UniProtKB/Swiss-Prot annotation:
Zn(2+) 2 binds at D115, E147, H360. Coiled coil: none annotated. One of its GO terms (molecular function) is succinyl-diaminopimelate desuccinylase activity. This is Succinyl-diaminopimelate desuccinylase. Its cofactor is Zn(2+); Co(2+). InterPro entries: ArgE/DapE_CS, Bact_exopeptidase_dim_dom, DapE_proteobac, Peptidase_M20, Peptidase_M20_dimer, Peptidase_M20A. GO terms for biological process: diaminopimelate biosynthetic process; L-arginine biosynthetic process; lysine biosynthetic process via diaminopimelate. It holds the Pfam family M20_dimer. SUPFAM superfamilies: Bacterial exopeptidase dimerisation domain (SSF55031), Zn-dependent exopeptidases (SSF53187). Pathway: Amino-acid biosynthesis; L-lysine biosynthesis via DAP pathway; LL-2,6-diaminopimelate from (S)-tetrahydrodipicolinate (succinylase route): step 3/3. Homodimer. It comes from Helicobacter pylori (strain J99 / ATCC 700824) (Campylobacter pylori J99).
């Protein structure tokens, strides 16, 4: 089965987060030779398929056991394709049923075509066509909760794999990373994300007696240039400068003759490795010195980076250039993804997938040529890793 046929089938399942709708049974049916692990919690389902190709024979393992570095010698390279089968709600005004895929003018239309059932379909097809000659462990990790909170999705599945000593060495998450043409972008990392709530305190009172009030909005005006849209560091070759962005402001009771007793500022900082929750706290404490305030900070994800010269990145680059005739840009732009959970376990991880011009949009679609090329790239990566 090719990537197009598999992707069409995947799109036909209305897997709006966290619904799985039986899609895992279909996927399992494609891989009868793979072992299966499943994990379900709080309505979220996760699937892990794996197969050891050309396993080391027992007598060889005994010989390896005599060697100093037994662990590295006995275990074959473990590579994992990862992704999510859940999609966001389709909304209205589609030209066709979002869960009845159609082909029109060289494109496959349907919810999830780009994000990310197209990528999943491509790596499933590549996995079916992979036949290495050396010992190699190939796995596939899928979750029904990436578009949602993600608490019981990939993160939980990786914890289970750690318990079973089945964590991969390398992984590609098939997120739609490309901007204009397939192959123009690889995500080799992601910025971290810190959410915050700042409350500046004042004294509520009658607007006609300002001398008896202390308006916190006046206080905010004096420090706003130092907390709105400011760069927290200079970035580096892999990351843009970390930036503090205000997302919401709230003050007052809704009455025109009452000054507020406080003003609440919600903000987010997307940050590089140069900025941490502690350094952000220190910066704000310095800016807000001597002012009455309360501050809450919470990190929702940590930044990570996979070296541009790593084995996985190099093999992926080589196959993109060979198949797509494009030199990919290595970057860390965009929001958070499940790749961060792999990185937290020390797994070498990158993201690569379809063009992202219609993700989460009406009439989402992926070109048929993209699916064909994406499958070839993924198969080339498998073959390249198994030969090196």
């Amino acid at each position: 089965m090719d990537a197009l046929e598999i992707t069409q089938k995947l799109i036909s399942y209305p897997t709006i987060t966290p619904k799985e709708c039986g899609i895992f049974e279909y996927i399992k049916s494609l891989f009868p030779a793979f072992k299966t692990l499943e994990c379900e919690k709080n309505g979220v389902k996760n699937l892990f398929l794996y197969r050891i190709f050309n396993p080391l024979k027992k007598h060889a393992e005994k010989e390896h056991a005599k060697e100093k570095h037994v662990k590295e010698n006995v275990k074959p390279l473990h590579f994992c394709f990862a992704g999510h089968i859940d999609v966001v709600p389709p909304g209205n005004n589609w030209q066709s049923d979002p869960f009845k895929p159609i082909i029109k003018e060289g494109f496959l239309y349907g919810r999830g075509a780009q994000d990310m059932k197209g990528g999943v379909g491509a790596f499933l097809s590549a996995s079916l066509n992979f036949n290495p000659k050396t010992p190699f462990l190939l796995s596939i990790l899928l979750t029904s909760d990436e578009e949602g909170p993600g608490i019981f999705g990939t993160r939980l599945m990786l914890e289970k794999l750690k318990e079973k000593d089945l964590l991969p060495h390398m992984a590609i998450v098939a997120e739609p990373t490309c901007e204009k043409v397939l192959g123009d972008s690889i995500k080799i990392g992601r910025r971290g994300s810190i959410n915050g709530k700042l409350i500046l305190k004042g004294v509520q009172g009658h607007v006609a007696y300002p001398q008896k009030c202390q308006n916190p909005i006046d206080t905010l005006a004096s420090v706003l240039p130092l907390i709105s849209g400011v760069h927290l560091d200079n970035g580096d070759e892999c990351f843009d400068p970390s930036k503090l962005v205000i997302t919401n402001l709230h003050a007052g009771l809704g009455a025109n003759n009452v000054t507020p007793g406080s003003v609440e500022i919600a903000f987010n900082a997307r940050h590089s490795l140069k900025t941490t929750q502690e350094s952000l706290k220190e910066y704000l404490e310095k800016v807000l010195k001597d002012l009455p305030y309360t501050l809450e900070l919470e990190s929702s994800s940590s930044p990570f980076i996979t070296a541009s010269h790593s084995k996985l990145t190099s093999v992926l680059q080589e196959n993109i250039l060979k198949t797509c005739h494009t030199t990919p840009l290595l970057n860390t732009k965009g929001g958070t993804s499940d790749a961060r959970f792999f990185s937290a376990h020390g797994i070498e991880v990158v993201e690569f997938g379809a063009i992202n011009d219609r993700i989460h949009a009406v009439d989402e679609r992926v070109s048929l040529k993209e699916l064909e090329l994406l499958e070839k790239v993924f198969l080339g990566v498998l073959e390249g890793l198994s030969e090196k």
